[in-house]
Amino acid sequence: MTYPQAALIVIDVQNDFCPGGALAVTGGDEIVRPINDLMAEFGAVVLTQDWHPADHSSFADNHAGSEPYSLVDMAYGPQVLWPRHCVQNSAGADFHPDLNQGAADLIIRKGFRASIDSYSAFFENDSQIGRAHV
């Protein structure tokens, strides 16, 4: 079945979220082949890419005395502090090497503002700042 008027949105299939990465998801690399297979079924393919500056406010090591997975209050609400991951231009921020990047019609980078995290391809965590760079 094909979906010519629909988009496949592929979220953060990056080295740091795969086994061996800084914020690895067990078996995260096992989804790459099925994603590649699905790409041909959709009219558009969008990839998102976590893309943090080194001084990102969500990194635990940027908060003296804080541990990964602890909570801090930010201007936009509670924020989980993460291990350093997906730093701009690092191997961890690269897409998984087997992901078919050539099939992407659009790549959306998120989390690139140092003072605010972003879990969405559409809005920053403050729900007020939309995507400025695609």
Ranges and model annotations:
Residues 33-131:
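Active-site alpha/beta core segments
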